[in-house]
Amino acid sequence: MRKFEPGNVHSTPGVNAKLKDAGFMRFMIVSLNRHINGDWGSMCDEDKAANEEALVDGLRLMSVYKRKDHPDDTIWIITEADRSATTILLPSEY
């Protein structure tokens, strides 16, 4: 069940370059759904709790996901405080 609306979803050039890999595309879609449903991925417990507070307080949300079959593939998903936009990016693009 969705915890929030993500607004316009964007991806960065680094993520777009990896979308040629169908497995990466599936990973990205599953990760986005997890983010919207409040599964914050590989965040520490403190950061997960901060996201739960951010849902109530209207602050920015961030999740981290690591691809199981390709551990070097990690994406960050950030939703703006006003929920107008969500960006999927590689950590190196932050």
Please place each PLM-identified region on the residue numbering.
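Compact soluble domain cores
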Residues: M1-S63
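Short, compact, well-ordered microdomains
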Residues: V56-Y94
